[in-house]
Amino acid sequence: PLGGARPHDVVLGVSIGPYADTPADLRVDDYKTLVDHFATLADYLAVNVSSPNTSGLRDLQGAPLRGLLAAILEERDRTGTGVPLVVKLSPDIDDLAAVVNAAEASGVDGIIFGNTTIRHQEGRGGLSGAPLGSSALRGLEQIRGRTGLPIIACGGILTPEDAAARIDAGATLVQLYTGLVYAGPGLVRKTARALQRRPPAIR
C-alpha cells in the first residue's frame, strides 16, 4: 500500500487526472479529490491535462488552464503538505508561449513536457518514443526560453545521449517511458550515471 513503508531515496510522483466520464465542468473536483488523497503520500503531484485518451482533456490547456491550476493549488495548500505541483503539457500545443505563461501565472512549481502526440498517421491514440523526440526537444527549448520554472523533459528519450540533450536544452530532470520497453529498467541507472559523469553545464 502507498501508505506503507517505501525507500526514502526513491522519488514518488503521482499523475492525477479526471475520470473519463466526468463532465467537463466537474473535472476540477476530480483533481481536487486526488490532491486530497495523495498529497501526504507523493513527493510531487503532476496535473495531467495532456492525455489523448480522455476526450476533451487537452482543451484544459487553453483558456481554463490558469483557473484550473489555481483551484488545484488552493486545494494543495489546504492540505498543509506543500507537496510540489507540476503540470504536464502536450507537445501538440500551437500557442506554447501562452500556455506556459498561464501555467507560470497560476503558481505551479514546474512543468512536465511533453506527453504523447496525436499528430501522426498511425491510427488513433497517442504516439510516443523516437518519433516524438525532435518535436519534444524543440518545445522544451521554447519553454526554457519563456520561464525559469523547473522543467521535467519527457518524450523520445531512449538513450543517455537523449537525456543529455534534454539537460543541455534546459531541462531540470528527465522522465523515461518508451525507452524502458526497449532497453529495460537498467536504462535508468545507465542514464543517471552518464549524466553524473558529464562536466557541469555552462549557462
Model segments located where?
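C-terminal helical cap(s) of enzyme catalytic domains, especially alpha/beta-barrels
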Residues: H120-G129, I167, T178-R203
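Hydrophobic faces of well-ordered beta-strands that scaffold small-molecule active sites
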Residues: L12-I16, L45-N48, L85-V87, I111-F113, ...
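Active-site entrance/lid segments in N-terminal catalytic domains of soluble metabolic enzymes
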Residues: P1-S106, H120
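Recognition helices and adjacent regulatory flanks at domain boundaries
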Residues: G133-A136, A153-A165, Q175, L180
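Catalytic cores of alpha/beta
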Residues: D29-K32, I93-S106, R144-T147, I157-V174
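Glycine-centered flexibility sites
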Residues: G13, G17, G110, G125-G129, ...
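Alpha-helix-loop-beta-strand connector modules within alpha/beta enzyme cores
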Residues: P1-D9, Q61-L85, G126-I151, T191-I202
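Glycine/Thr-rich beta-alpha phosphate-binding loop at enzyme active sites
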Residues: S51-G62, A98-G145, L149, A183, ...
